[in-house]
Every structure is written in C-alpha cells, then in structure tokens.
Swiss-Prot record:
The keyword Cell inner membrane does not apply. Pfam families: Mur_ligase_C, Mur_ligase_M, MurD-like_N. Transmembrane segments: none annotated. Pathway: Cell wall biogenesis; peptidoglycan biosynthesis. It comes from Geobacter metallireducens (strain ATCC 53774 / DSM 7210 / GS-15). It is found in: Cytoplasm. This is UDP-N-acetylmuramoylalanine--D-glutamate ligase.
Length: 452
C-alpha cells in the first residue's frame, strides 16, 4: 500500500490511533486526526505526536474531513452506522481499521484468533508456543500492542499472532491470515449490534479473504461455528471434544490428538496447569495453529505444560472457613459464565454490571442445577432477577463489597463463591481489572473486621 502523499484521516486518539498517526506521518502521508475529546483530555497522546506533521480536529468531527480523505482509519469503538463514516462511504472513500492497515505491511505467516470467549488466552498461548519452538513472534492486536506498532518499529519477526474482535473485522477489505481461528460464538455486544446475526456476520469476516492454501480452525462442537464450515474458501481444520476426527484436533480420555495429512501427535493433559472444558478448547486451537505453521510437537507440549493462564479468569482468591472464592471478572458475557458455572457445584454466584443486551436465559439450566444462592449487582440486576431469580435463592446488593459480605454469610463450608458477572463493568468501575481488584480486596477483608 502506497501511503506517501495520501490524505489520511485517523479517527480516535487512543493508543492505536497514536501509533497509526505516527506511522503514517513518518511515512509521508498527510495526516489529520479527529477526536471528540478536547485538547486537555488528550494531553498525553498529543505529547506522543509532538514534532510530527499532523493536523488536529478536536472536540468535534467535521464531515468534510471524512468526505475529503483518501483513506479513513477508524477506531474499532466507532459504530458502522456513524453518520461521519457513512458520509465517507457515500463519497467513495476507503474506510478501514488499524488491523487492516497494518496487515498490508505484514509479510510473514499470521494467525488471527476470534470468538466470543477464550480469545486472549488462546492468542497468548499461541505466541508462547511459537516462541518456545524458536520462532521470533509478535503477539498483539486486540490485546497488548496494536499490530501497527510492529510495522512502525520495523522489528524482524517470523510469526505474527493477533487477537481480533468483531469491531476490528467490520472494516476489513484485504485482511488475510494464514490461519484463522474461530473458537465459539454466543450472544454478545448486542448493545452494539442490532441483531445476533449481525454479530455473527462480523465474526465470520475473519475468513473472508482466505484461500484454499490457508487454514480455518473451527470449533465444530459449537453449532454456529460448525455451520460456517461450508462457507469458507480456506481448508477447514476442525477441533472437537465430542468426537474423534480423522483430520483435525480432538480431545478424548485425557489426551489431545492432532491429525493432519497422515501426521499424528498426542498431548497428554495430565500436567497442564490450566484446566476446564473451555481451556482444553483454547489449548486445542493453539496447538492446531502452531503445528500447522511448523512447530515441533515436543516443544509445543512443553510450552503448554508451562503455561499458567491469564489473570481474572476463574482465579482462586482465597479459601476461608471451608469456602473457596473465585474471581472471574473477565466473564463479561453469558457464554463465559456458562463455562464457569459448569466447573463447580454448590455455587453462590455474584453477577451483574452493565447490561450488554443479550438474554440471560441460557444460564437457566446451570443456575437451577448448580447455583444455591445468587447475589446481583449493577445496572443489569433487575433484568437478571426477572430472567433467573425464580430459579434459586436470589438477593440484591448495592455495591460489590456488600455482595461479597452477603455471599460469605450465605455460603456453607464446601461451597464456592464465584464472581462471574456476565456483564461489562462500566456502570460501576473503570474496567474489568478494577472490578477484579475490588472483589479481591473485599474477599481478603472478610474475617478481619476491616472495610475493603
């Protein structure tokens, strides 16, 4: 892609926008940056771009800028129906996201990973396996470093692994990973998409530009994902925990088996540090992607056995008076909470937060079977109570700290207090990490007489 001399509009000045603007300006583009925040709110990002030839339109957007740009690079947070983006499209301008822009400059094999749940764990583990197998590897995308930072920095790598969100996929046009992974699809982001089908359609775009020499790793245990197999041009490489596969990767009797073109590799799971049905899925996907792109099985197994998982995903905080307290703040949708509930019995569930628009009804069977008490918080608590409250003993709390104290008083020895919200955090907290720390502080204050 030739960018020198082109008029390029960068929409949004968060970390990714800064990296995009810097890369473009240093490579001769005529860059305009626009953001709805004012100069004082953007002091940090503006300092990072000091000395570069960049025009700023702050505290507003100007439709004329969108219509005049050769290319508009948009933040994933900007919805497709934005009138400014529609103005750009009407004027025949190219609208892309950072991941599309950056991918045009990547020449080494790329693994792109998406799904409603498990993306970050799978992306991180895939990078760990590649590195253990001796490949210089970049890991980023929707986590950590934006892909454009690799392009901008000029670092020489041999493999690229990126986590991709549905938002990032909305504006791709030529993005083509060598291996694309779709872990699962459950209802999520219905505060962004008008229908569940719109969300599915965005996810499936990860395969849009692949060819038969590429691979689509599909979790065929997920009926929606399985239904996509006939729609992709890439070679489908299935994964399953429910059946043995002649070609693909599957789990049976404590062993993950990889089969491809006559090659078979076996990976006993007994020494894995991360457990649970969902983590076996993540590990299978990582093994598939890395072995398809040249990794040695023994080195891959050693990397998996050494991987301890990521924070805020079903982490044991402490055990007190025979009750175990688990923090699962990253569980921001129903699908991830289903997997958490399936991992325990005798649960006191703390849930709630900012409502994302999906139904909580899929949780009903597990709530009925495994949840003894439920304590609800946040903006979503009333709707959650309407959909699930009749299935078990259900209480309301005003704060997370109050919810923890109430859960502690309700739970018998041998039980589990599980904080798995099924909602985003933005009604009460800065992000899911702050929410996690508040839960941990409240749990650690139990029995001390102290206020968290």
């Amino acid at each position: 892609m030739e960018i020198s001399g082109k008029n390029i509009l960068v929409v949004g000045l968060a970390r990714t926008g800064v990296a995009v603007a810097r890369f473009l300006a240093r490579n001769g583009a005529r860059v305009t940056v626009t953001d709805l925040r004012d100069e004082s709110a953007l002091a940090g990002p503006l300092r990072e771009l000091a000395g570069l030839s960049v025009r700023y339109v702050l505290d507003r957007h100007d439709e004329a800028d969108f219509a005049a740009a050769d290319v508009v690079v948009v933040s994933p947070g900007v919805p497709q129906e934005s009138p400014y983006l529609q103005a750009a499209r009407r004027a025949g301008r190219e609208v892309i996201t950072e991941i599309e822009l950056a991918s045009r400059f990547v020449t080494v094999p790329m693994v792109a990973i998406t799904g409603t749940n498990g993306k970050t764990t799978t992306t991180t583990l895939t990078g760990e396996i590649f590195s253990a197998c001796g490949f210089r590897t970049f890991v980023g995308g929707n986590i950590g470093n934006p892909l454009i930072e690799l392009v901008e920095g000029g670092e020489t790598v041999e493999r690229v692994v990126v986590e991709i969100s549905s938002f990032q996929l909305e504006w791709i046009s030529s993005f083509r990973p060598r291996v694309a992974v779709l872990l699962n699809i459950t209802e999520d982001h219905l505060d962004r998409y008008a229908t569940f089908q719109e969300y599915i359609d965005a996810k499936v775009r990860i395969f849009e530009n692949q060819e038969s020499t590429d691979y689509a790793v599909l979790n065929v245990d997920d009926p929606i994902v399985a239904g996509i197999a006939g729609r992709v041009a890439a070679t489908v490489f299935p994964m399953s925990q429910q059946r043995e596969l002649a070609e693909g990767v599957f789990h049976r009797d404590g062993v993950i088996t990889f089969r491809h073109q006559g090659r078979e590799e076996r990976f006993p799971t007994a020494r894995f540090r991360i457990t649970g049905v969902h983590n076996i899925e993540n590990i299978m996907a990582s093994l598939a992607a890395t072995l398809l792109l040249g990794c040695d099985a023994k080195q891959a197994l050693a990397a998996v056995e050494g991987f301890g998982g990521l924070p805020h995903r079903m982490e044991l905080v402490r055990e007190l008076a025979g009750v175990r307290y688990y923090e699962d703040s990253k569980a921001t949708n129903v699908g991830s909470v289903e997997k958490a509930l399936a991992s325990f019995n005798d649960i006191t569930l703390i849930a709630g937060g900012k409502d994302k628009g999906g139904s909580y009804a899929p949780l009903a069977p597990l709530v009925t079977e495994r949840v003894r008490h439920m304590v609800l918080i946040g903006e979503a608590k009333e709707r959650m109570a309407r959909e699930l409250g009749s299935l078990t003993d259900t209480r309301m709390a005003t704060t997370l700290e109050e919810a923890v104290e109430l859960a502690a008083s309700l739970t018998e020895p041998g039980g589990v207090v599980l904080f798995s919200p099924a909602c985003s955090s933005f009604d009460m907290f800065r992000d899911y990490e702050e929410r996690a720390q508040r839960f941990r502080a409240a749990v650690n204050a139990l029995g001390t007489g102290e206020r968290p």
